[in-house]
Curated annotation (Swiss-Prot):
Recorded GO MF terms: nickel cation binding; unfolded protein binding
Keywords associated with the record: Chaperone, Cytoplasm, Nickel, Nickel insertion
Keyword set includes DNA damage: no
Protein name: Urease accessory protein UreE
Pfam families listed in its UniProt record: UreE_C, UreE_N
Cellular component per GO, a single term: cytoplasm
Gene3D superfamilies in the cross-refs: Urease metallochaperone UreE, N-terminal domain, UreE, C-terminal domain
Compartments in which it is found: Cytoplasm
InterPro entries xref list: UreE (IPR012406), UreE_C_dom (IPR007864), UreE_N (IPR004029), UreE_N_sf (IPR036118)
Stated family: Belongs to the UreE family.
Example GO BP: urea metabolic process
Protein task: Involved in urease metallocenter assembly. Binds nickel. Probably functions as a nickel donor during metallocenter assembly.
HAMAP family given in the database record: UreE
Amino acid sequence: MRMNKQIVVTDWIKEKPRLGSFLKLTLTSDERKILRGKRLTDCDQEIILQLPRNGKLNDGDILSTNESNFYVEIIAKTEDLIEISSNSKNELIKTAYHLGNRHVEVEIEEDILLTKSDYVIENMLKNFKVDIVNTQKKFSPEKGAHSHD
């Protein structure tokens, strides 16, 4: 659904409304960090993000707009990632340490680490006792120690 009016996105809402129109906005993990500026929704509707500067957009977030019955739903885009696993928790922890030491964004799951596909990082990982697999998934990295959200 497209509107001719300018749609301004102003805030997060806690619960998905039962009524109203939803625009989907699919973004990468990097794009989800930027809370201000023009974007095109999945149906090519231009919107303007004017969100409070704290925080980050997450997969499934619902945002309110200047139009009372219009909402924007955030969808995390599938990205090229490296999936890192090991039979040894200790090796996985060491690997996470070295990735963090290089300021590489990492998503931590139960038995795997995920990071963005990068040939330099992939070559570094070959020096560890871990298994690496190229995959495509939604990416939600951990907040950094110096994060402002």
